[in-house]
């Protein structure tokens, strides 16, 4: 700002100021005040060479005041407080306040520090330069005071879902007034603020009306302060506690594939969450009674051996002190699956066995006497083939009627083996008897004295079979 300039011919005033500095302390102060009063009456002129800067400082920190001269002519510089009391005259400090310390003194600058700044130190400080004419400039010290206390208060410690609650935040004794911002989690909300001023200090109270939901349970409500004396984030917070009615969900735990058929087992589990935790979970069947074979165990519903009569809607109900809720499950029982056997390929190996059966035939000539004659052995392979063919036909018929039945095939094979063994046994026995058995007369004749005649009779019987008249009978 512009400084008052002394008129020409007033060098005596500067000399008087120098003399006042050398006078005793009590007289010195009076002379300086008189000199300053006289200088203030001098009209303003041009040629300002004295400069200062405003200072902003946080309470408790250090403020630096500097009086600078642009074009120095070795004139006297002094610093005064808002009450016009001299703090420093050149490098001399008349004021008995040790918080003021001289940092630099020269013909072009007077720099002074003020430690532990308080709100009472705020105001205008004057720099004076005793030139011809004298000059004066001032600097303003602004003291910032951060909030001394930050408090948040919730109307209700525990809220119920759907309620609207009041939350207040107070920032006390700040300068200037603070700005309060609200956050719920990461979402910013808008509140209403009121400011109270007392002794140049400000108290700000912000009110937030908040409607809570179950999702807000455990979410912090943050009161954040913005102030020039505060670096970073100054904030306080409270966590919401919201009670809400149960949330019910039904899970089918069996069968795992999710398809219910007749004869299957069936199980449902009811999951209920809430605040406070639900104290009662019950199962009911909507519009009908619960099946008698249904088993209820806490949150679980179990039905064994499902049938069509179990179709319907099953409801799980849960409740707490806030309220109750339910969830429904519609059961539909499907028909049991139809079992179709997979196609099988049966390979049948047919073995044809030709059996030759030897039958012993004894022919007795009815035209002769009672002596029998053995004509020989006759083989009838055709009869064996017919018998084998019948067995084979029966075997094939059995196989066609029992495709896929392994037991029947095994039994048929065993029977065939037994039949074959019996036929072989008959053949062996037939051959045996054919070789060792003759007629009664033949054996008796061979045992007598005239065995030779008996042999002749046998030969005649074998050789003369075509002519009955030539047959001769011998009686032994």
Swiss-Prot record:
Principal location listed in the UniProt entry: membrane
Positions annotated with a glycan in the UniProt record: 70, 104, 116, 168, 307, 311
Source organism per UniProt: Rattus norvegicus (Rat)
GO biological process terms, semicolon-separated: bone development; calcium-independent cell-cell adhesion via plasma membrane cell-adhesion molecules; cell adhesion; cell recognition; detection of stimulus; heterophilic cell-cell adhesion via plasma membrane cell adhesion molecules; homophilic cell adhesion via plasma membrane adhesion molecules; liver development
Originating gene: Cadm1
Keyword Phosphoprotein part of the UniProt annotation: yes
Keyword Lipid biosynthesis: no
SUPFAM superfamilies per UniProt: Immunoglobulin
Signal peptide: 1-47
Localisation: Cell membrane; Synapse; Postsynaptic cell membrane
Extracellular side: 48-408
Description of post-translational modifications: N-glycosylated.
Comment on protein domains: The cytoplasmic domain appears to play a critical role in proapoptosis and tumor suppressor activity in NSCLC.
Positions of disulphide bridges: 67-127, 169-223, 270-316
Domain Ig-like C2-type: 147-241, 246-332
Domain called Ig-like V-type: residue spans: 48-142
PANTHER family the record matches: CELL ADHESION MOLECULE 1, IG-LIKE DOMAIN-CONTAINING PROTEIN
Keywords in alphabetical order: Cell membrane, Disulfide bond, Glycoprotein, Immunoglobulin domain, Membrane, Phosphoprotein, Postsynaptic cell membrane, Repeat, Signal, Synapse, Transmembrane, Transmembrane helix
Listed GO MF terms: cell adhesion molecule binding; PDZ domain binding; protein homodimerization activity; signaling receptor binding
Family of this protein: Belongs to the nectin family.
GO cellular component terms, A-Z: axon; basolateral plasma membrane; cell-cell junction; dendrite; glutamatergic synapse; neuron projection; plasma membrane; postsynaptic density
CDD domains: Ig, IgI_2_Necl-2, IgV_1_Necl-2
Task of the protein: Mediates homophilic cell-cell adhesion in a Ca(2+)-independent manner. Also mediates heterophilic cell-cell adhesion with CADM3 and NECTIN3 in a Ca(2+)-independent manner. Interaction with CRTAM promotes natural killer (NK) cell cytotoxicity and interferon-gamma (IFN-gamma) secretion by CD8+ T-cells in vitro as well as NK cell-mediated rejection of tumors expressing CADM1 in vivo. In mast cells, may mediate attachment to and promote communication with nerves. CADM1, together with MITF, is essential for development and survival of mast cells in vivo.
InterPro entries found in the cross-reference section: CD80_C2-set, Ig-like_dom, Ig-like_dom_sf, Ig-like_fold, Ig_sub, Ig_sub2, Ig_V-set, Neurexin-like
Domain of life: Eukaryota
Protein's name in the database: Cell adhesion molecule 1
Lineage: Eukaryota, Metazoa, Chordata, Craniata, Vertebrata
């Amino acid at each position: 700002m512009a400084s008052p300039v002394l008129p020409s011919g007033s060098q005596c005033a500067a000399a008087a100021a120098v003399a006042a500095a050398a006078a005793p302390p009590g007289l010195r102060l009076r002379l300086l005040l008189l000199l300053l009063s006289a200088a203030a009456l001098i009209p303003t002129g041009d040629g300002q060479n004295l400069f200062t800067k405003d200072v902003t400082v946080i309470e408790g920190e250090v403020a630096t005041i500097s009086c600078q001269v642009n074009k120095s002519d070795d004139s006297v510089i002094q610093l005064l407080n808002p009450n016009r009391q001299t703090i420093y005259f050149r490098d001399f400090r008349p004021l008995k306040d040790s918080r003021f310390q001289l940092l630099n003194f020269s013909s072009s600058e007077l720099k002074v520090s003020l430690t532990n700044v308080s709100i009472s130190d705020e105001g205008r400080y004057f720099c004076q330069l005793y030139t011809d004419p004298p000059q004066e400039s001032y600097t303003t010290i602004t003291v910032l005071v951060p909030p001394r206390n930050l408090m948040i208060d919730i109307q209700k410690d525990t809220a119920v879902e759907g309620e609207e609650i009041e939350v207040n935040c107070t920032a006390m004794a700040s300068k200037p007034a603070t700005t309060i911002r609200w956050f719920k989690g990461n979402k910013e909300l808008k509140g209403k603020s009121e400011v109270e001023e007392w002794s140049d200090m400000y108290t700000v109270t912000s009110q937030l009306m908040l409607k809570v939901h179950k999702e807000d349970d455990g979410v912090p409500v943050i009161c954040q302060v913005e102030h020039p004396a505060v670096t970073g984030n100054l904030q306080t917070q409270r966590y919401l506690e919201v009670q809400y009615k149960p949330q019910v969900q039904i899970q089918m735990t069996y069968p795992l594939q999710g398809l219910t058929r007749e004869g299957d087992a069936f199980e449902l589990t009811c999951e209920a969450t809430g605040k406070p935790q639900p104290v009662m979970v019950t199962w009911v069947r909507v519009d009908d009674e619960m099946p008698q074979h249904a088993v209820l165990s806490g949150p679980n519903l179990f039905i064994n051996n499902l049938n069509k009569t179990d179709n319907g809607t099953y409801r799980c109900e849960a409740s707490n002190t806030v309220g109750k809720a339910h969830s429904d499950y519609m059961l539909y029982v499907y028909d049991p699956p139809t079992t179709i056997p997979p196609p099988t390929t049966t390979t049948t190996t047919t073995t044809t066995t030709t059996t030759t059966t030897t039958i012993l035939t004894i022919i007795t000539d009815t035209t002769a006497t009672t002596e029998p004659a053995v004509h020989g052995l006759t083989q009838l392979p055709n009869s064996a083939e017919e018998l084998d063919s019948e067995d084979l036909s029966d075997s094939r018929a059995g196989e066609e009627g029992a495709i896929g039945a392994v037991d029947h095939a095994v039994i048929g094979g065993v029977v065939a083996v037994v039949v074959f063994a019996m036929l072989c046994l008959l053949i062996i026995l037939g051959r045996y008897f054919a070789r060792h058995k003759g007629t009664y007369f033949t054996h008796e004749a061979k045992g007598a004295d005239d065995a030779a005649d008996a042999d002749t009779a046998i030969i005649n019987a074998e050789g003369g079979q075509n002519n009955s008249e030539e047959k001769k009978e011998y009686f032994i």
